[in-house]
């Protein structure tokens, strides 16, 4: 018999439902993919350093991280980054590089179609 444990964080459960509904309404598969990754256990969430974002993102691009952005490394370009959480050092380094930190909810409101968004994990 397998154990099923539901998420206890109300922000996270509401976000998952919102992502699934938006995916269905706008036929945007990217939001369903993000919702699926957030339904996994917390230990499987992405932890992405700024050095990886700097390596794979281009200037002016929008990146989504289904997990936490960490502040290790340097960011030399301005990118929009949406994530579940940010470390304090990551937030300050992104702002110093003229980038933008946002929650997944904010990105969902700004871009419900999900066009031009890349997932990093």
From Swiss-Prot:
Keyword match Ribosomal protein: yes
Transmembrane regions: none
Single GO molecular function: structural constituent of ribosome
One Pfam family recorded for the sequence: Ribosomal_L18
Keywords: Ribonucleoprotein, Ribosomal protein
UniProt cross-references to SUPFAM superfamilies, sorted A to Z: Ribosomal proteins L15p and L18e
UniProt KW Manganese keyword: no
GO annotation terms (biological process): translation
One GO CC annotation: cytosolic large ribosomal subunit
Matches recorded under NCBIfam families: PRK04005.1
UniProt record similarity statement: Belongs to the eukaryotic ribosomal protein eL18 family.
Protein name, as recorded: Large ribosomal subunit protein eL18
The species this protein was found in: Methanoregula boonei (strain DSM 21154 / JCM 14090 / 6A8)
Gene field: rpl18e
